[in-house]
Regions:
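PLP-dependent amino-acid enzyme catalytic core
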Residues: 1-468
Length: 468
């Protein structure tokens, strides 16, 4: 399996190469030359597998340059009890009225990002050790990616992490998870701005090929294909757990940067019988607007709202380019032209392709408000006893619009509610204690560097602290 760029300017590379590469040299994103296919008989044969062994089967289709027994060791190290609280790794719970909850928050940072990041922590160390080199991870987080990456990579050999976060725009629990880490290879940088500005700095630094090469910059954001591939596994798992034999399921996905639902798009393209991919946004509804109108119109920082589902306060979805690549017939020249239009005009129009969004690719979309979130959290708890976080509530609210008889609808859990205590208290009128082992998290000393949104200042910080 080789990988190319969505913009056509990268020679085919292996899985391990793109794992370390991050953004492609031409500014595009790595994508498989062709998607591997899984037939119905193979799918059925995977029903009895553990999550770790299912991950091996799926990831072996993408990471063809890693010997099979080595890869199996990596997936078993990543997906095991002790790292994850549930024996199933990803439990499925009933929510009633045709909905089920895919439990993706059983990992060490209580968020779905752990599902991919625990594998990345293993495979980064594996590849770097065998190549005898180092890597400096530079990423941006709106709340959950940062802590998941840092917990997966803390203390790992040959890796340093530089994680940018928007100052004052994450929950207290999210900040404490990241900033309380004291490991010497973890560096937190809070920038005075919004997530999109932090992400722009990361892309700017990654786009400087001389700097990227000298300091061996890598990525753990979902621009890294390994993140997307690892997330594909839980769509297979969800189908195997919820679908009647040979039947279809739908997935509802709270969406900000388009990485999570993109993995569903990939799983569907590989052969998982997915009826619909239901995209749910909050008030920052750039993606919902695209699937409703066909026009992609990102907003500036001044029009990116601070909401009660803060991890989705994103107005430029970096992973969207991979879907557009498929939408325009895998034409890299067309993708490069569209992103040039975006840079020049601030938008592009694919409304002529709008009929394909659902009929060919299964995408539908909806948005949720603060009032919707509070009501959904309260009603879900009252009706089922299941407490969900505000992002998952966005998913449930939108999912209800698209439930079909006989087609299970799995809502992807985003995080545990303890990470968003203020919103849960507003919804239920009472506080939700964090897990016992994290009760003192917010009182721990915190280590973070505060900066303006200045790529040169971030560059200087990396130069001073990088592993070289």
């Amino acid at each position: 399996m080789k990988y190319i760029s969505t913009r056509g300017g990268m020679a085919p590379q292996s899985f391990s190469d793109i794992l370390l590469e991050g953004l492609a040299p031409d500014g595009g994103l790595a994508i498989p030359e062709q998607l591997p296919q899984v037939d119905a008989a193979t799918l059925e044969s995977w029903r009895g597998l553990s999550y770790a062994d299912l991950a091996f089967e799926v990831l072996s289709l993408f990471a063809t340059d890693i010997p099979a027994e080595d890869l199996r060791g990596l997936t078993r190290a990543a997906y095991r009890q002790g790292v994850f609280k549930s024996e199933d790794i990803v439990p499925v719970r009933e929510l009633g009225q045709g909905l089920q909850l895919l439990g993706l928050s059983e990992g060490p940072t209580l968020a779905f990002k752990d599902m991919a990041m625990q594998f990345l922590g293993q495979v980064f160390e594996y590849v770097l050790t065998r190549r005898g080199t180092t890597l400096n991870i530079v990423g941006a987080t709106s709340g959950d990616t940062g802590s998941a990456a840092e917990y997966a990579l803390r203390g790992k050999q040959g890796v340093a992490v530089f994680m940018l976060s928007p100052h004052g725009r994450m929950s207290a629990f999210q900040r404490a998870q990241m900033y309380s880490l004291q490991d010497e290879n973890i560096h937190n940088i809070a920038v005075r701005g919004v997530f999109d500005q932090a992400q722009d700095i990361v892309k700017q630094l990654a786009g400087d090929l001389a700097f990227k090469t000298r300091y061996r910059l890598g990525a753990v954001n979902s621009i890294n294909w390994a993140r997307i591939a690892a997330q594909v596994v839980y769509y297979f798992h969800g189908w195997l757990r919820a679908a009647p034999k040979g039947g279809e399921v739908s997935f509802a996905v709270p969406s900000g940067n388009f990485g999570n639902i993109l993995s569903g798009h990939i799983a569907r393209g590989m052969g998982v019988p997915i009826r619909r991919l239901v995209l749910a946004t909050n008030e920052n509804n750039v993606l919902e607007e695209f699937f409703r109108t066909g026009v992609y119109r990102p907003r500036g920082p001044e029009h990116t709202y601070a909401t009660s589902s803060p991890s989705m306060d994103i107005s430029r979805a970096s992973n969207f380019e991979r879907f557009v690549f498929d939408l325009v017939g895998r034409d890299p020249g067309r993708v490069a032209s569209l992103w040039a239009d975006l840079a020049r005009d601030g938008s592009f129009d694919l409304s002529a392709l709008k009929p394909q969004f659902e009929t060919r690719y299964g995408f539908v979309a909806g948005a949720s408000s603060h009032a919707d979130r509070l009501l959904t959290i309260r009603n879900t708890f009252d009706e089922t006893g299941v407490l969900v976080d505000p992002h998952t509530a966005d998913g449930i609210k939108v999912a209800r619009q698209f439930v079909e008889p006989g087609v299970p609808m799995l809502v992807l859990e985003t995080a545990l509610p303890a990470k968003f205590a203020e919103t849960i208290e507003a919804a239920l009128g009472r506080t939700v204690p964090p897990p016992a082992d994290l009760a003192d998290l917010e009182s721990l000393p915190q280590r973070v560097t505060l900066m303006d949104c200045d790529a040169q200042a971030v560059r200087a910080f990396i130069e001073a602290h990088a592993k070289v």
